[in-house]
């Protein structure tokens, strides 16, 4: 994948930052940085990949090929998910913190799936990288801003309905039925929407 050097660079930068952080900051920052990794990979890089494929007429070829929309989208979700998982686990391993790696892995895969689907959906409606950036910035703000409020102590149960908060809780090892249901519903909804977006 053409973006692998950039993904590797992000991972290396994250690991370096975590290694030099004082211990009181490390626990919170580790989970936040691991969360941001699938967000950036899934949303930003997937958007760029889809735009490149559109410029190469891949979408038109897909329309007349035996490959289904579901197979196309799932291949993106799985490939980006595995890259995000590898990157996230490496960050966790080198952070010097203890983690529940099962919870972490599930959170990374679900987060990667969600934001990959968001990236596919957004890029289906635009044709240039500039337009994608205009849409991506407010999307990132909506996705990430509630985390700062949550980590500062405002931990209302209603906030668990926000996908990013649910993912942060899951990656931290704090499993709840509400957070699992919330992120599952968000992923299913975005999968349906991305299928409809690619078909249009």
Question: What label would you give each PLM region?
Answer:
Residues 42-46, 90, 117-122, 163, ...:
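Hydrophobic/aromatic residues in alpha-helical transmembrane segments
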Residues 31, 39-44, 74-75, 99-106, ...:
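Short alpha-helical transmembrane interface motifs in multi-pass membrane proteins
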Residues 69, 77-127:
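Alpha-helical transmembrane segments and their short interhelical loops
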Residues 1-2, 109-145:
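A structural motif at transmembrane helix-loop-helix junctions in multipass membrane proteins
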Residues 1-45, 134-147, 182-191:
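Hydrophobic alpha-helical transmembrane segments of multi-pass membrane transport/permease proteins
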Residues 145-197:
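Terminal transmembrane helical anchor/hairpin motif
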Residues 26-64, 69-91, 135-138:
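Hydrophobic alpha-helical transmembrane segments of multi-pass membrane transport proteins
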